[in-house]
Amino acid sequence: MKMSKNVDGVKVQNQGDLVIYNGHKYQYNKDITSILFMGVDRDKINTDEEYLKKHGAGQSDTLFLAAVNTSTGKISLINVPRDIMAYVKTYDENGKYSGRKLRQLCLAYAYGDGKAKSCKNAVDAVSKVLYGIPIDSYMSINLSAISVLNDAVGGVNVQVIGDLTSVDPTLKEGANVTLLGGQAETYVRSREFDPL
C-alpha cells in the first residue's frame, strides 16, 4: 500500500481510492462517474495548424466537474477555479514534452492542440489538483457555442448585475432580461464589472 503526502495534512492511498485529511478517511465512491466540462476562450474550433500557430489552443477559462452518482441519479457540480496553481504537463513549440511546471490550471488546455490533446492535458491537471480522482469523460466548448446552447433552452433569464449598456442598451443594471442569441455571449464575456 503506497502512501504519498500531497499537501500539509492530506495523504492519498491506493491510487486515490482513499484520502486522509485531518485524520478523517474518505473512500472513493465507485458509483460516481465524473465529467469535466471546459469552456475555452476561442471563437472557433482550432482545426488547422496555421490557426493554432497564430492564435494558440486557448485556455479553459471555465472548468466544472460533474459528479454523477449512477446509483442515485444525483448530480453534483464542482466549480474548479481556473486560477488554481497546479503542476501542468508542458510542451515546447514543437510539441515535445518539457515536464510538469507550476502554472495556472487554465493553461493546461493551452499546452495542446485545441482538441483531444488539450482536453486530456486539462483532465490530467484537474485530476492531480483533486488528489488523483479519476475523471471518466470530458467535453469542451468554445465561445461560439454559448448562443447555441442558450437558444436551445429558450434563453436564460438573468437579473443584470452590472451596467452593461455600453455593449448592449438593454443590459441595464438590475433589469430582468431573457438573454437570446448573441446577447448571451455578450453578457458572459463582459468584464466591465466585477460581480464579486
Segments predicted by a language model, with ranges:
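Non-catalytic, solvent-exposed segments at the cell envelope interface
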Residues: 1-196
